[in-house]
Amino acid sequence: VPKVLLVSRFSWILIRRRSHSADTFVHLIGVTHPSPAKAAQFRAVDLVSIKVAAKAARDAGVRHFVYLSVAQPAPVMKAFLEVRRHGEELVRATGLSATFVRPCYVLGLGHRWPYPLLPFYWLAERLPWTRESARRLGLVTIRQMIRTLVWSIENPPNGVRILGVPEIRATTLSLPQNDRL
């Protein structure tokens, strides 16, 4: 069973000290409810945290880094996309094996407004001229994300692995039933 480190601090020293016994570092830190109006927060929170985390994980000898990124390319949220892309570059530069998980939007508690759009996504995934974009920018559930993160931790890659929306949807792993997810 891999040893996993979950932290929510910006302290490189704290992260480095706690990372020594971990096999996998999972980075989930980011601004809540992203919107184009939060560009400065993306740089102050998301970018700073990934800089600290990537360096600390490398220095601590962690073997696998899991980074929650975002679907790329995407037509909106340019600052968010830019920060996440830069975060991926920082993780790649460490030389660690890495998994970049790239959802577009995660449906779950408090994030249900896009459900009425599901029929439009279904149609767009079937039309040849919109299929690729609709699949890359599709909606995933919190349950699919949890399955993907757990699977990523339990199956570290040799090198870099990118899991986009199609891969997130296809991840199979049994999870206990929980109606809240």
List each model region and its residues:
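NAD(P)H-binding glycine-rich loop region in Rossmannoid oxidoreductase-like domains
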Residues: 1-52, 56-59
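SDR active-site strand-loop-helix element
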Residues: 28-29, 65-71, 101-103
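Active-site proximal helix/loop that lines the substrate pocket
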Residues: 30-33, 70-73, 108
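Short amphipathic alpha-helical segments at helix-loop
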Residues: 34-38, 71-72, 130-133
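Hydrophobic, well-structured mid-protein blocks that either form specific transmembrane helices
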Residues: 41-90
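Oxidoreductase cofactor-interface core, primarily capturing Rossmann-like NAD(P)-dependent enzymes
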Residues: 60, 75-176
